[in-house]
Amino acid sequence: AALGAAAVIPACGGAAGDKSLSGLDRERFRSEVNGRPTGLYTLTNAAGMEVCITNFGGRIVSVMVPDRTGTLRDVVLGFDNIADYVRIPSDFGASIGRYANRIGHGRFVLDGDTVRLPVNNYGHCLHGGPDGWQYRVYEAHQPDPRSLALTLHSPDGDAGFPGAVTAKVVYRLTEDNAIDIAYEATADRPTVVNLTNHSYFNLSGDPTHPILDNLLTIAADGYTPVDSTFLTLGRIDSVGGTPFDFRRPKAIGAEIDSDDEQLRNGHGYDHNWVLATAGDLSRPAARLVSPVSGIALEVFTDEPGIQVYVGNFLDGTVRG
């Protein structure tokens, strides 16, 4: 993902003392979860951008990026301490595993055998179940100020999944304000693995300002519709003539209240778009722009689809 604004990016120094540019106190992230140490790790570049990550759940906690005036703004949702991440179940900024999104009815067939998993969302297994990797402590290694490698070992039978898996997530902040996230997983036997990042972006940089005016573009002619339990129906529908057509920039809120069955099923947008950019990293799969701040986010991926979720179940009672 690349973040930027239509402005000259000023050079900025590092955070003073033991606090990040976003105001995070590193001491509030120094703890233990299930006997494993947690911490806050900071990535910086010469352009003044800062990304803070905790190894609890491999989560992006804050992203400071300059707006059109050069003012640094935090554009992701996150808590300011490890205790809230542990106490309040959420996927804020998390590295999701062992399997992102839903496995229908908590079961799948592998090599002729039916594997059964815990269900935690409308009768399905969502994001690896109730004890997904977003609640685990990763081993952290920071070789330089611009990168962080996180490693997790998941034993055979973990949350019902077959095979022992070693997963590695590498975050890298580039000099042109891109956050590069690379995933790698190895298993000792056939299994399923599907990894992603679950950050919530508000490019206005103002948590009181809704995202509905953000302009979204998705390079996709089709999407996969879902039933009322958010499970895909096994087909690809055209976005043409529907609220799911973001082939040209459109405000997220422009049609979100339309009388549309798919919007009702998803309680808003919580769908997978079938990308026209599949396998092509030379052009963005999606682009989001805040008219308030001028900050733009471009997403590049070599995957065939992109899931867009606009926080339909965030009711404002949890603040990050």
Identify what each model region corresponds to.
Residues A1-L3:
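N-terminal export leaders
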Residues C12-V51, N55-G320:
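An exposed, glycine/acidic-rich loop-and-rim segment of catalytic or binding clefts
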